[in-house]
């Protein structure tokens, strides 16, 4: 994806500038840097952000290896990676409530995080 620049805003600029577009964030502390979470809320406004979990069925399970679509994933702490490539995220092992808590820990006001996790997706 091309970067957002002042002369060629690209897809990010188009998304921010289009009122009907919503931004979905996997706010697990792994997929997206906290500053990007804050910037997204600032650019789109709390009414246009949706928190999602991308939660795998290994969510809540202890660290270890788990089957995933004919492949194997490794869960270690809050991180799920492909067993054959530890640099590739397999998904998230954080619940939506955990994502909401992360958003608040990143500086998103509680009311905005609750809205993004409940009202906006509905």
Language model feature labels by segment:
Residues 1-10:
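Divalent metal-binding pocket/active-site signature
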Residues 4-5, 30-33:
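A conditional alpha-helix N-cap/helix-loop micro-motif detector
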Residues 10-29, 36, 41-122:
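His/Asp/Glu-enriched, well-ordered alpha-helical/loop segment
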């Amino acid at each position: 994806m091309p970067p957002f620049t002042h002369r060629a805003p690209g897809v990010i600029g188009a998304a921010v500038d289009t009122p009907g577009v919503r931004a979905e964030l996997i706010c697990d502390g792994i997929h997206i840097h906290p500053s990007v979470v804050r910037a997204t809320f600032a650019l789109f406004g709390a009414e246009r952000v949706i928190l999602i979990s991308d939660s795998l069925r290994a969510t809540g399970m202890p660290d270890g290896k788990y089957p995933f679509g004919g492949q194997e994933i490794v869960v270690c702490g809050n991180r799920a990676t492909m067993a054959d490539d530890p640099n590739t995220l397999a998904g998230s092992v954080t619940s939506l409530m955990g994502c909401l808590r992360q958003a608040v820990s990143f500086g998103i006001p509680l009311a905005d995080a609750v809205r993004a996790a409940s009202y906006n997706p509905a």
